[in-house]
A protein has these predicted regions:
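Terminal targeting/low-complexity segments that flank the catalytic cores of oxidoreductases
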Residues: 1-102, 106-115, 137-145, 149, ...
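Alpha-helical transition-metal enzyme core signature, strongest for iron centers
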Residues: 90-94, 98, 121-136, 167-178, ...
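Residues at alpha-helix boundaries and short interhelical turns
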Residues: 108-112, 126, 140, 188-192, ...
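Active-site-proximal, substrate-binding regions of enzyme catalytic domains
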Residues: 118
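Active-site-proximal alpha-helical scaffolds that flank and shape metal-associated catalytic sites
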Residues: 134-203, 230-240
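Soluble, non-transmembrane catalytic domains of enzymes that act on hydrophobic metabolites at membranes
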Residues: 189-199, 207-228, 269-272, 308
Length: 308
């Protein structure tokens, strides 16, 4: 590679790292730090009375007038249903992600470390999806599918997305939930099973985030200009979908609350706005650095409520 080539493979964060070296390190980490949730977690242990299923500060209605009128029992029940809804959302995201990864490696050498790591990540995501499904079933809560319009938008996105668009969406689906889960697994107020699920997910998702970030940096340097611009717009629209889908309104109905009133209070809540923006900040700072948050795309991100 000439000096001119090296200069091309730079962005605002510096020189891009070698794709194969990154994948080899991630493969080594996967070999040492991967988990089988079926054997790692105690699925038969009863839930502990009085413990939350999600930290109360992360429950959507926290610190709203409706929250202050709710009993502690109803608040905990809402945390259980919101945890189930987020697990359902996580399964939806991971099924999309697995298809995007398969598309990404379709034309690449199967013997490369980059492809082998993508296949390893798909293995991880299969386990995570099964783990989330088992958590939902264990709690006797319903599965909370996304709205049909979002289901269809996801189907369209995973079909037409550019490679940089795919990795931007991957990071959006992973990093906000990851931020919340990092607050959840050490929290002793939370049910041990939920803490165990989030611990496994955080450890394994850290590798997925590294892989996606490094590949997105490369793509935003090497992709055609039209692809970069298309990525900016589609990522902004996906952020809008994500922000809406993050709350499934049926959780309120299922715990005896007025759905419309609850959604209105969540939308007006400064605390909830701060939680979502804090959860997305590490990602939005990164996307800003690599020139994803530009033009129309940036305005869409801001309208999603994830960008201050």
């Amino acid at each position: 590679m000439t000096e001119a080539d090296i200069d091309v493979l730079r962005d605002a964060l510096g020189l891009l790292k070698d794709r194969e070296q990154i994948a080899e390190r991630l493969l080594a980490s996967s070999a040492k730090h991967s988990f089988d949730p079926d054997s790692e977690l105690d699925w038969d242990a009863p839930f502990e009375e009085g413990k939350w299923f999600w930290p109360p500060e992360l429950v959507s209605l926290y610190d709203t007038p409706m929250w202050r009128r709710m009993s502690e029992e109803q608040r905990i029940l809402l945390s259980q249903h919101e945890a189930a809804a987020l697990a359902s959302l996580g399964i939806w995201f991971e099924i999309i992600l697995m298809q995007l990864l398969v598309r990404h490696i379709y034309d690449k050498p199967a013997t490369s470390a980059h492809v082998r790591y993508a296949l390893t990540e798909i293995e991880d995501e299969c386990r995570h999806s099964k783990m989330f499904a088992r958590l939902i079933s264990r709690g006797d809560t319903p599965w909370y599918p996304v709205a049909r319009v979002h289901q269809n938008l996801g189907r369209l996105f995973k079909t037409i997305s550019t490679t940089p668009g795919s990795f931007t969406a991957t990071l959006l689906g992973e990093e906000v939930l990851d931020w919340m889960q990092r607050l959840t697994f050490p929290d002793e107020r939370v049910q041990p099973l939920v803490r165990g699920v989030t611990r496994i997910h955080v450890v394994e998702e850290a590798r997925h985030v590294r892989y996606a970030r490094e590949e997105l940096r490369r793509q935003m340097v090497t992709a055609p200009k039209w692809s970069q611009e298309f990525t900016r717009v589609t990522s902004g629209e996906f952020a809008r979908v994500f922000a809406i889908a993050f709350i499934n309104p049926e959780v309120y109905t299922n715990v005896g609350l007025d759905k419309r009133a609850a959604l209105a209070q969540v939308k007006a809540s400064p605390h909830r706005r701060e939680v979502m923006q804090n959860g997305a900040k590490r990602l939005t700072d990164f996307l800003d650095d690599i020139r994803v948050l530009r033009g129309v795309g940036r305005r869409l991100w801001r309208s999603s409520g994830l960008l201050a």
